[in-house]
Swiss-Prot record:
Its cofactor is pyridoxal 5'-phosphate. Its EC number is 4.2.1.20. It comes from Staphylococcus saprophyticus subsp. saprophyticus (strain ATCC 15305 / DSM 20229 / NCIMB 8711 / NCTC 7292 / S-41). The gene is trpB. The beta subunit is responsible for the synthesis of L-tryptophan from indole and L-serine. GO terms for molecular function: tryptophan synthase activity. Keywords: Amino-acid biosynthesis, Aromatic amino acid biosynthesis, Lyase, Pyridoxal phosphate, Tryptophan biosynthesis. NCBIfam families: trpB. This is Tryptophan synthase beta chain. The modification N6-(pyridoxal phosphate)lysine is found at K94. Coiled coil: none annotated.
Length: 404
């Protein structure tokens, strides 16, 4: 057991030094309303029953824990299990949170949603639940991401969402969050901000974490059923950090090694990366204090990753806290390392992972061979690679791969 870990935000919304509510005064009533509504929902067994029913019959939970026999043999060392979030309806972990927050919005009497999206997966998940519950949805998406993920844009529109292109800044996820927050400020009476990652002002990091912790809860039960023990190590990719915090949270007080993998882009020594923890420092963005990529003057730097879902310049407050206390080790994977792992894994297991998930797999390739073959390593496959086929093909063409 690992003792003395803060597992809930304090009264001011902080995990250690990170978190808080750095928002304009105009938003505070909405934040307080959300916090109260969430507390009420959390204490209402009926809310949880309704959520569980939708997760089971609509999303398709629980997701399998698949033994990666060929990949384990290829790498040598640990026995590798895959947590298959790629098999959720809509193809990623994002639906867990979108569904929970949509039910919460309904409970608050709000029939309109606003969301941000990077890779488009959270946008698709949000559009899906908006269609399911007959709610209006506006999605803000960076211009650059719209180019990279045109198929997901069409999916969102087909589902009835209005997709707004964000041209400010770098035209990526960070800019989309800015616009979504601005929109929420002016439509706060009838609109809920369906934030997609474990960031933003308190209570968002806690809400998103709680709706994603089903990943880790299922892993714990499934490994116990298959192996009669806890896993020895768990690996997940980290952008804003929602799939990773959902994976790690049920294990933070257990004797289990936890590894988050950040996107190193062109490389850890380049200036094109998304290494908020490994190369960033403390700062405030989008309503919360967390690790951020900044220059020497404290200006927030542009994040870069081949994965549209990981190119965010910060990492949520709970991850920032776990890094500081040494509970989670944050490793890195470059674009090349992630893509190489993606190809190896796909050929070994017949599963095409999202590029985000391939960052976690890249670190598995480093970690697994250092472990004994009776040790258990679980990696969260946060999403499937369908949305990334164009990016993968273009990358392989550039690399001169004959399969592209």
């Amino acid at each position: 057991m690992v003792e003395n870990i803060q597992t809930e935000a304090d009264a001011f919304g902080f995990f250690g030094n990170y978190g808080g509510q750095y928002v304009p005064e105009t938003l505070m009533p909405a934040i307080q309303e959300l916090k109260q509504a969430y507390q009420d929902a959390k204490n209402d067994p009926q809310f949880q029953i309704e959520l569980d029913d939708y997760l089971k019959d609509y999303v398709g939970r629980e997701t399998p824990l698949t033994y990666a026999k060929s990949y384990s043999e290829l790498l040598g060392g640990a026995k590798i299990y895959l947590k298959r979030e790629d098999l959720n309806h809509t193809g990623a972990h994002k639906i867990n949170n979108a569904l929970g927050q949509a039910l919460l919005a309904k409970r608050m009497g709000k029939n309109k949603l606003v969301a941000e999206t990077g890779a488009g997966q959270h946008g698709v998940a949000s559009a899906t639940v908006a269609a399911l519950f007959d709610m209006e949805l506006v999605v803000f998406m960076g211009e650059e991401d719209i180019k990279r993920q045109s198929l997901n844009v069409f999916r969102m529109e087909l589902l009835g969402a209005k997709v707004e292109s964000v041209t400010e800044g770098q035209g990526t996820l960070s800019d989309a969050v800015n616009k979504a927050l601005q929109y929420w400020v002016s439509h706060v009476d009838d609109t809920h901000y369906l934030l997609g990652s474990a960031l933003g002002p308190d209570p968002f990091p806690t809400i998103v974490r709680d709706f994603q912790k089903i990943i880790g809860q299922e892993i714990k039960a499934q490994v116990h059923e298959k192996e009669g023990q806890l896993p020895d190590a768990i690996v997940a990719c980290v952008g804003g950090g929602s799939n990773a915090i959902g994976t790690f949270y049920p294990f933070v007080k257990d004797d289990v090694k936890l590894y988050g993998v950040e996107a190193a882009g062109d490389g850890i020594d380049s200036d094109k990366h998304a290494l908020a923890i490994n190369k960033g420092k403390e700062g405030v963005l989008h309503g919360t204090k967390m690790y951020l990529i900044q220059d020497d003057d404290g200006q927030i730097q542009l994040a870069h990753s081949i994965s549209a879902g990981l190119d965010y310049p910060g990492v949520g407050p709970e991850h920032s806290y776990y890094h500081d206390i040494g509970r989670v080790k944050y490793a890195t994977a470059s674009d090349k390392q992630a893509m190489d792992a993606l190809v190896r894994f796909t050929k070994a297991e017949g599963i095409i992972p999202a590029i985000e998930s391939a960052h976690a797999l890249s670190y598995v390739e480093t970690l697994a061979p250092t472990m004994r073959n009776d040790e258990i390593l679980v990696v969260t496959v946060s999403g499937r690679g369908d949305k990334d086929m164009e990016t993968i093909r273009n990358y392989m063409k550039q690399e001169g791969d004959t399969h592209a």
